[in-house]
Amino acid sequence: MSADLQETPKAGDASLERLEQSVLGFRRLSNQLLAVIVTIGGLGFTLTCLSSYLGRDLLPIGSPSTLLFVPQGLVMGLYGIAGLLLASYLWAMININLGAGSNNFDKASGMVKICRRGYFKLISAEFPLKDVKAVKVEVRDGFNPLRRLSLRVQGRRDITLTRVGQPLPLAQLEQDGAELARFLDVNLEGL
């Protein structure tokens, strides 16, 4: 399975009865790098504002103390505050690991359990395995590409199984969809 959907290995015959996939959340390297860059930028703008106000260079590069506090220093301060607020939001989402969870398919109990971590609580959906009608693969290329694996469930909207973010490679998406459809003994739609 991919890094997005990772099968948890089970011992013996239990692997034929149960499939568990972990789903990667917000705690990805790309999000952490973005949070670091935004934090450094926000601190830089804030220190530039303070340097302009105090008349002393607080940054090792440039000479921000020569900037006039009104209007350049104030604008730098606003950019710095906005950057630090955005950075704190990103770090909070990384700490929460928003969107992380698991997909559990249990033939023995006949249940499917989908769990995801939300902003303030764990979001969970349970339904009978017999209600799953198909595994759906959605592919859309272009400016905003979409590669999604979802379950078609009777009486519900399609339930997405893959993470939001960078699209999976097409071959991996097809392989994951085929393995899941084979395990659930349902059709694979969308290809």
From Swiss-Prot:
<keyword id="KW-1133">Transmembrane helix</keyword>
<dbReference type="GO" id="GO:0031676">
    <property type="term" value="C:plasma membrane-derived thylakoid membrane"/>
</dbReference>
<keyword id="KW-0812">Transmembrane</keyword>
<comment type="function">
    <text>Seems to be required for the assembly of the photosystem I complex.</text>
</comment>
<keyword id="KW-0793">Thylakoid</keyword>
<dbReference type="Pfam" id="PF02392">
    <property type="entry name" value="Ycf4"/>
</dbReference>
<protein>
    <recommendedName>
        <fullName>Photosystem I assembly protein Ycf4</fullName>
    </recommendedName>
</protein>
<dbReference type="GO" id="GO:0015979">
    <property type="term" value="P:photosynthesis"/>
</dbReference>
<keyword id="KW-0472">Membrane</keyword>
<dbReference type="GO" id="GO:0009522">
    <property type="term" value="C:photosystem I"/>
</dbReference>
<keyword id="KW-0602">Photosynthesis</keyword>
<feature type="transmembrane region" description="Helical">
    <location>
        <begin position="33"/>
        <end position="55"/>
    </location>
</feature>
<feature type="transmembrane region" description="Helical">
    <location>
        <begin position="70"/>
        <end position="92"/>
    </location>
</feature>
<comment type="similarity">
    <text>Belongs to the Ycf4 family.</text>
</comment>
<dbReference type="InterPro" id="IPR003359">
    <property type="entry name" value="PSI_Ycf4_assembly"/>
</dbReference>
